[in-house]
């Protein structure tokens, strides 16, 4: 199921692969976010050419926007979307708990009010697993509570305990799955920013022995130093035999630091989101295409990129599209940023294989200032 090909000599970075029902996924792996079964503005063909073998979709949004019965009629999310690669489906818990005034938690699940039409719903840990089983998800994520930075210890302790209980009931559901379904369950560790809670959460989750482990509840507004502290602390408690997934990170500097600490999988919608403001990822840092200096610029965004934008169009033309709020500009910029992320991951893999990860990481981070990103 999971194999490591090469460990970095000096750090915890590693290269390997994960065998899933719809094909092999190489690690480290950046997972693009296709909330409703597709990336905004991008054809599946773009991702297929990039050899993207794992996309994230969101159970909460699919449940509210589409409905489980529709997916069931199509015999799964893969058939419905005509995506023949792997899906990881998040429970949507982060989204539910972000609406603090629209939800109520109990020991079995969460009552919430739809942000779309005001209808009332109830998610349980068992129900979330059943939905993702209907989806045919290749990786299932359980219901969990992603608590915000700055809450007190007692509240964090309560949410950690509830998350562990939900993980246990989800794990039991996974043992009674329908015949022929081979999706992997990755259980989520929580604990907010209290190390004793993190340690207890990880130990409790490890006792269940799920195929993979996710670190949740970081990169939620905390200072970068606190993020790195909890990331390193959590990593040291997770056995190397398990694939490790940090939820909700995806900017280049966060990815490089996560890989440094031995993280294998990450996701983020940031590469697509920043295109709304005309921000492009390049080897020389963030390019803000809306600046006046690019108005008459006939050159390409990046010479060594083979995306549609860089093969055909100028910086000046893209600036015109973005400033005019033309959808085509967002599509071109999104494709470029996704190309960039996959190219970056490929370079990182090569650096690890060549025992050059330290030099690569150091030189790369010099080009990217923290203020250029909004994680």
From Swiss-Prot:
Gene3D superfamilies: Queuine tRNA-ribosyltransferase-like. It comes from Borreliella burgdorferi (strain ATCC 35210 / DSM 4680 / CIP 102532 / B31) (Borrelia burgdorferi). Homodimer. Within each dimer, one monomer is responsible for RNA recognition and catalysis, while the other monomer binds to the replacement base PreQ1. The active site is at 90 (proton acceptor), 267 (nucleophile). GO terms for biological process: queuosine biosynthetic process; tRNA wobble guanine modification; tRNA-guanine transglycosylation. Belongs to the queuine tRNA-ribosyltransferase family. Its EC number is 2.4.2.29. GO terms for molecular function: metal ion binding; tRNA-guanosine(34) queuine transglycosylase activity. Substrate binds at residues 90-94, 144, 190, 217. Binds 1 zinc ion per subunit. Its cofactor is Zn(2+). It comes from the Bacteria. Pfam families: TGT. Transmembrane segments: none annotated. It catalyses: 7-aminomethyl-7-carbaguanine + guanosine(34) in tRNA = 7-aminomethyl-7-carbaguanosine(34) in tRNA + guanine. This is Queuine tRNA-ribosyltransferase. One of its GO terms (cellular component) is cytoplasm. Residues 248-254, 272-276 are annotated as: RNA binding. Keywords: Glycosyltransferase, Metal-binding, Queuosine biosynthesis, Transferase, tRNA processing, Zinc. Catalyzes the base-exchange of a guanine (G) residue with the queuine precursor 7-aminomethyl-7-deazaguanine (PreQ1) at position 34 (anticodon wobble position) in tRNAs with GU(N) anticodons (tRNA-Asp, -Asn, -His and -Tyr). Catalysis occurs through a double-displacement mechanism. The nucleophile active site attacks the C1' of nucleotide 34 to detach the guanine base from the RNA, forming a covalent enzyme-RNA intermediate. The proton acceptor active site deprotonates the incoming PreQ1, allowing a nucleophilic attack on the C1' of the ribose to form the product. Zn(2+) binds at residues 305, 307, 310, 336. Pathway: tRNA modification; tRNA-queuosine biosynthesis.
């Amino acid at each position: 199921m999971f194999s490591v090909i090469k460990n970095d000599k000096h750090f915890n970075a590693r290269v390997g692969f994960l065998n899933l029902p719809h094909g092999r996924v190489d690690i480290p792996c950046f997972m693009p976010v296709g909330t409703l079964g597709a990336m905004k503005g991008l054809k599946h063909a773009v991702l297929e050419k990039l050899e993207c073998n794992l996309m994230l979709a969101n159970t909460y949004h699919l449940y509210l926007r589409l409905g489980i019965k529709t997916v069931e009629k199509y015999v799964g999310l893969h058939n419905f979307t005509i995506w023949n690669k792997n899906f990881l489906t998040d429970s949507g818990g982060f989204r539910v708990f972000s609406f603090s005034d629209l939800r109520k938690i109990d020991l079995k699940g969460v009552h919430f009010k739809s942000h779309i039409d005001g209808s009332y719903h109830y998610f349980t840990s068992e129900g979330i697993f059943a939905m993702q089983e209907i989806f045919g998800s290749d990786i299932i994520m359980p219901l969990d509570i992603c608590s915000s930075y700055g809450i007190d210890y007692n509240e964090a302790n309560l949410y950690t305990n509830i998350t562990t209980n939900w993980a246990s009931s989800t794990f039991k559901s996974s043992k009674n799955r329908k015949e022929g379904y081979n999706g992997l369950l990755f259980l989520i560790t929580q604990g907010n920013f209290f190390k004793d809670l993190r340690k207890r959460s990880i130990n409790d989750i490890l006792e269940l022995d799920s195929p993979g482990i996710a670190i949740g509840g970081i990169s939620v507004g905390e200072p970068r130093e606190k993020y790195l502290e909890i990331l390193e602390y959590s990593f040291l408690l997770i056995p190397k035999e398990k694939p490790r997934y940090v939820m909700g990170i995806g900017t280049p500097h966060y990815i490089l630091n996560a890989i440094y600490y031995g993280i294998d999988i990450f996701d983020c919608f940031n590469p697509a989101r920043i295109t709304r403001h005309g921000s492009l990822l390049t080897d020389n840092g963030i390019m803000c295409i809306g600046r006046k200096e690019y108005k008459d610029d006939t050159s390409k965004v990046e010479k060594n990129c083979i995306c549609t934008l860089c093969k055909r169009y100028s910086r000046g033309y893209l600036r015109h599209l973005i400033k005019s709020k033309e959808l085509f500009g967002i599509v071109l910029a999104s494709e470029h940023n996704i190309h960039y992320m996959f190219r970056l991951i490929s370079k990182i893999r090569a650096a690890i294989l060549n025992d050059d990860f330290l030099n690569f990481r150091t030189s790369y981070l010099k080009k990217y200032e923290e203020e250029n990103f909004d994680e």
